[in-house]
Amino acid sequence: MVIILFIRRRLATNPLSTQMCIAGTISGSGDCLAQYLSHNQEWDRWRTARFSFLSSCFMAPSLFIWFRLLEKVKGNNKSLLLVKKLCIDQLCFSPCFNAAILFNLRLLQHQSAEKSWDLLKEDWFNIYATSLKVWPFVQVVNLCFVPLNYRVILNQVVAFFWNCYLSYITQKPIDHIEQFY
């Protein structure tokens, strides 16, 4: 209970930094679970660090700004407004956001920009198509019921499981990375 009160106070006073810390923690935990479920012999700390860093320093700030921009979309009919926001989110933001995550994740794996781009082209469509089976429902709940400062957190709670999937899909063995560490 004390931790919930602490988080509520932090979200009221410093929403971005609080959301960044929570996002990094949840994302790192999701990667740990993905590694465990894939029966990795040894825990890859660098892999977990990459996911945590990307989530806290890129995803959380991007979503923080995005949800505030999405709030500026106005309309008289609540149902139509929800559909409008959902379409903007899933057809404009989500494809770009997924691409940026995949590209940056590969850069954090010490891939070249060219190799990162090639891997993005290889993985993007399947990941985006799968995201359309999950995130529209999450966003309906988010946009209808969740206060603005809590939306990134709800996304990250769902992203705990999504990141397990993303981690599994994107962490194909890469020979030269293993020798780098």
From Swiss-Prot:
Domain of life of the native organism: Eukaryota
Membrane-protein topology: Multi-pass membrane protein
Pfam families cross-referenced by the UniProt entry: Mpv17_PMP22
GO CC entries: cytoplasm; mitochondrial inner membrane; mitochondrion
Principal localisation: mitochondrion
Keywords: Membrane, Mitochondrion, Mitochondrion inner membrane, Transmembrane, Transmembrane helix
TM spans (from-to): 20-37, 51-67, 86-103, 152-169
Entry's localization field: Mitochondrion inner membrane
One example GO MF annotation: channel activity
GO biological process annotation, one example: regulation of mitochondrial DNA metabolic process
Annotated signal peptide: none
Stated family: Belongs to the peroxisomal membrane protein PXMP2/4 family.
Function in brief: Involved in mitochondria homeostasis.
Protein name in UniProt: Mitochondrial inner membrane protein Mpv17
